[in-house]
Amino acid sequence: MRSTLLRIVALLGYLFFLSSCAGLDVKLDTAKKSSIKGNRVIIFPFYDPFYRGRQIQGVGEPFATVFTNKLLAAGVSAELPKSREFSSLNMVDIEKACRYAADNGYTMLIIGVVTEWIEGATNWSGTVDVAALSVKVYSSKTCELSASASGRENGTWFTFVNAPTTRFFEPLSEKIVEALLK
């Protein structure tokens, strides 16, 4: 009787563990027309996400900074714009971004949107933390789409530490950069 009860408790614990595991999924959305490797690339601030009809400010710019650092670590010449003309609060105008990139000597540009952002587990709400990012790569001369990739990472159903959703910046950026470089 006691060993049966122990087995049931162990099985339930194992199932609870499996159901609360985190996941990371990244894919190349379009076939690449040209590689970012060997090009001078500018990364515009990623557009801030919306949750329940409200824009969550302050997510897109730090996400773009981490993404830029991952590109640099992969050997890609990448920078953020020096102009404050572009902000994560507004969707980047493609034509304006292409002009800015071409005028400043960049051969490619990356525009991104944080498509999903949920901070839940840190509040013990039973809601899973989620971050999702979609990026598009354009040629600065023609403004033609060269590639696009997206990724989504979700946390566990619970957490034992106060770990904000910003913890997904690094792994999600790294995997999307890997997808763009393949």
Predicted stretch roles:
Residues 91-145:
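Surface-exposed short loop/turn segments
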Residues 48-51, 85-88, 115-119, 153-156:
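Solvent-exposed loop/turn segments at secondary-structure junctions
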Residues 19-81, 179-182:
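A structural "domain/chain start" motif
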Residues 54-62, 91, 159-171:
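Soluble non-cytosolic domains of exported or imported proteins
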Residues 126-132, 138-182:
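Short secondary-structure boundary motifs at beta->alpha junctions and helix caps
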Residues 1-21:
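Sec-dependent bacterial lipoprotein signal peptides
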Residues 79-94:
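Acidic helix-start/capping segments at beta-turn-to-alpha-helix junctions
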